[in-house]
Swiss-Prot record:
Source organism per UniProt: Schizosaccharomyces japonicus
GO biological process, any: positive regulation of protein catabolic process
The name this protein goes by in its record: Ornithine decarboxylase antizyme
Top-level taxon of the source organism: Eukaryota
Spans through the membrane: none
Subunit structure: Interacts with ODC and thereby sterically blocks ODC homodimerization.
SUPFAM superfamilies per UniProt: Acyl-CoA N-acyltransferases (Nat) (SSF55729)
Length: 226
């Protein structure tokens, strides 16, 4: 069971340094009403906030002033076996090795300087903590029929019961579009969920479309062009 910060309700608070969350770079007025998605990769850690009324706020500059503990630098986040198996089955083989990678934040550079995502993000495992859940994903870099490079963000949440489609997905869509520079968001939904019809309706309402995927036996796949 995930431990949660009573103020922000972020899952798995051990993944975060509370000094970073409370960094002065995020104003109190914005912090009290913001929905936060916390993005971690093997070589960077940065925060992304979006308000319920829309609009985005990057507060990654606060990370450079706070050094995470040695325990945090060494820590590996456990990836549930069923999620790893799902990615191994459903993702294209070009995504590379899907072994769990250590999350070691880099303090020497800003991963979103000038609004651009760090080049090291491509084909990397990524974790996103939003207010009521934790998402595991992979950023896959591909080329379209016109040989234009594009990034696809593939995501599976740990618990569909806690998915907040209104706030959580808005934060994730903004994160993928504005700063991870992804052109497509792909979400895998367990076909055996009792609330699957509700989720399918909700995904259609948000703008997702079903994607045929013969290799995905246990999951329905939904995609959105960003």
């Amino acid at each position: 069971m995930a431990f949660r910060n009573p103020i922000y309700q972020l899952s798995n608070t051990e993944d975060l340094n509370l000094d970073i969350i409370n960094a002065p770079s995020l104003e109190n007025s914005r912090r009290s009403s913001a929905t936060l998605a916390v993005c971690t990769t093997e070589d960077s850690k940065f925060l992304y906030g979006t308000t319920p009324s829309g609009g985005a706020e990057w507060c990654s500059e606060g990370i450079n002033s706070v050094r995470p503990s040695k325990r945090l630098l060494r820590r590996r986040r456990h990836v549930p076996r069923w999620i790893s198996d799902s990615f191994r089955t459903c993702l294209p083989k070009s995504s590379g090795n899907l072994k769990e990678q250590a999350l070691q934040p880099s303090l020497d550079r800003n991963p979103c300087r000038n609004g651009q995502a760090d080049e090291a993000l491509r084909n990397k495992r990524i974790g996103i903590a939003e207010p009521s859940n934790y998402w595991h994903g992979i950023i896959e870099e591909t080329y379209d029929e016109h040989h234009q490079r594009q990034r696809n963000l593939h995501l599976i949440p740990e618990n569909w019961q806690d998915v907040n489609l209104k706030n959580g997905l808005v934060a994730i869509i903004d994160l993928a579009t504005d700063h991870l520079q992804c052109s497509k968001l792909i979400i895998y939904v367990d076909k055996h969920l009792p609330n699957l019809p509700y989720l399918v309706k909700s995904f259609h309402w948000v703008g997702f479309e079903p994607i045929a995927h013969p290799n995905c036996v246990d999951h329905a796949v939904f995609g959105m062009d960003l």
